[in-house]
Amino acid sequence: MELFGVPIQTMYLYTLIIAGSLTLLFLFFGDVFSGLSEGIPFLNPTLVLSFFTCFSAGGYIGELVLPLSSLLIALLSCILSIMLVVLLHIFVLVPLSSAEESLAYREDDLRGRLGKVITAVPVDGFGEVVIEGIGGTISKSAVSFDNQQISYGTTVLVVDINNGVLSVTPHEPI
């Protein structure tokens, strides 16, 4: 079969090369076009480019391997591409969009958090406090803010941070 005087296999191959190249460009420079998909979520450029890439790859391979008509190969390729794009959307893009941007934290973010003493804090010395959160568990050196001993297992409140060392005080729940 020919389309615009060009064999359909060649059209599939050209589409594959162009869509694949645009997908790679969008992968590298996608932040520039980040606002394009906000209004209409199903027209996400990642999904559209993935559809054309899968469609043209499926059509090209189908034309080479399958002894079916070109129209049936295009239909099968379209159905396969829609299924792959839906799976990409559900299992990759939706979880990525709802994930936290980073698991990193700033030390200032620890101020006001509750932790638990895992190494007793002596009067004029260092102990260790563990702070649990959504992003994981953070273990930091600690000193007593009130210059008093804090025993193992005590729940503490982070008051200040100096040079990576937490200043903590025992926490009494209200």
Curated annotation (Swiss-Prot):
<keyword id="KW-0472">Membrane</keyword>
<protein>
    <recommendedName>
        <fullName>Membrane protein NfeD2</fullName>
    </recommendedName>
</protein>
<feature type="transmembrane region" description="Helical">
    <location>
        <begin position="47"/>
        <end position="67"/>
    </location>
</feature>
<dbReference type="GO" id="GO:0045121">
    <property type="term" value="C:membrane raft"/>
</dbReference>
<feature type="transmembrane region" description="Helical">
    <location>
        <begin position="72"/>
        <end position="92"/>
    </location>
</feature>
<keyword id="KW-0812">Transmembrane</keyword>
<keyword id="KW-1133">Transmembrane helix</keyword>
<dbReference type="InterPro" id="IPR012340">
    <property type="entry name" value="NA-bd_OB-fold"/>
</dbReference>
<feature type="transmembrane region" description="Helical">
    <location>
        <begin position="16"/>
        <end position="36"/>
    </location>
</feature>
<dbReference type="GO" id="GO:0005886">
    <property type="term" value="C:plasma membrane"/>
</dbReference>
<comment type="similarity">
    <text>Belongs to the NfeD family.</text>
</comment>
<comment type="function">
    <text>Plays a role in assembly of FloT membrane rafts, probably recruited to rafts by FloT.</text>
</comment>
<keyword id="KW-1003">Cell membrane</keyword>
